[in-house]
Structure formats: C-alpha cells, structure tokens
Amino acid sequence: MNDIKIQKLIWDSTFFGFEIGKIEVNNIEDNKSFKNLIEKSSFQMIQIFSKNDLSKLLGLNPIDIKLTYSKKPSKFNNYNNIKSIDCDLDHTLYSLARQAGKFSRYNRDFKLKMKFELMYKIWMKKSLERDLADEVFVHQNGNTINGMVTVNKSFNYAKIGLIAVDENSQSKGVGSQLIHSVENWALVQNLENIFVCTQKENSVACQFYEKNKFNLSDTIYIYHLWKK
C-alpha cells in the first residue's frame, strides 16, 4: 500500500469548502489496507481515478466513466459564422457552459451539485480571459450565439475544454463547424493531435465525436468516495 498516495486537490478543497483528495490507482491488492488509508485520512471526500472498474472492490458505482477521444487535425474551409470571442455580453456563454456540464460528475453528485453552476461559470469566465483556454470560438448568426467551444494547447496537442450548442440549433451542423475551426486552429499552432473528454453516459456527445472522426483513446473510471 506504500505506493498509493492521496493527493490534496487544493482548488477543489478551497472552492467547495472542505478537504478533497485524489487517488490514481489501477489495482487494489490489499483492500483492507486501502480502506484503512481512506479512514485515517483527513479528507471528507476522495476522488478515485482508475483505468479498471473497481466497483466491486469499493462497493461503489463510478460517478463517471470518462472517455477521451482524439484525432489528428485536418484542414477545413473557414466559416463566416465562426468568431473568436473574449467576453460574454448577454450571459449566453455562461448558459452554454452550464449546458456543456450537464453530464458532469459535479452535477451528478448531489453533495456537490449546489456549486456546479458557479464552477462552470468560473470555467467559462477564465476561458474568456485566456487563463483556462488559449482560444474561444463561437458560432454566431447576427447577434445570436448558437454554440461555443474552448480550446487550449499543451506541448504538441490541443485539448477541447467546453463545447455546447444551443438546443434550438442542434442537428444543424453548428457543432461540426466549431470542431472544424478547432482543427484549423490546431494546424496553425502546429499541433499534432486534438483531445476531448466526455462521459460514457453522454451517448449523444460520443456519437458526435465519432461522426467527426475522433477515436476513443482512453477510458477512466471515477469514483467519489465520501467518508461516513
């Protein structure tokens, strides 16, 4: 058990107002010692990340099965409706950010849900300020924003953070245009791959990424273990 450590999640602990830790582990060989480690810790909640399904060992269902999709960027024509943006004048982007997090584990966990909307508002705000994103694209018809995507670069790849399309504009190609704009941006930045994460439960998002030639590259089981 000496190789299993609990890492304090500083931002999460500060934001939610109690101690939150994180464990990354793929196999638990000594379940008794693992439970001992949890019980003796000072954390009120521990997030457990694993490449394997630990449900039986933990006696707990995953709060999220996180899927990571990836693809190499391709060149597309530029779209007149796609704009770069750095402010949210009418709160449309904050609304879309909340929509992007509909299947988020922070929304699904009833003990965290009360701060879910604020969390995604902060995420959108810091993306517009370019603290959590290098670029924010919107799909706009006149003065109406129909969709948005945030993206940042890390090393030789781009990572999509938030993406959402207004309910009235779905199934009209808006999301694909946003993805294509990210691909064009990634090529300009000389980035080799694009990554995006979603939840297995969000089947519509999974189908959307697969339609846009993304391939599943990783699966992570996430558990929220609350101390009694």
Annotate each predicted stretch with a short phrase.
Residues 11, 47-50, 62-71, 195-198, ...:
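Conserved catalytic-core motifs of GNAT/GCN5-like acyltransferases
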Residues 15-27, 156-167:
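Conserved acetyl-CoA binding element of GNAT-fold acetyltransferases
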Residues 24-89, 223-224:
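Acyl-donor-binding surface of acyltransferase catalytic domains
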Residues 29-37, 162-165, 171-188, 207, ...:
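Conserved acetyl-CoA-binding loop-helix of GNAT-fold acetyltransferases
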Residues 34, 51-64, 172, 176, ...:
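Conserved active-site alpha-helix within GNAT-family acetyltransferase domains
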Residues 54, 113-140:
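Active-site rim helix/loop that mediates acceptor-substrate recognition in acyltransferases
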Residues 81-104:
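A short beta-loop-alpha structural element at the N-terminal edge
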Residues 133-149, 166:
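Conserved beta-hairpin
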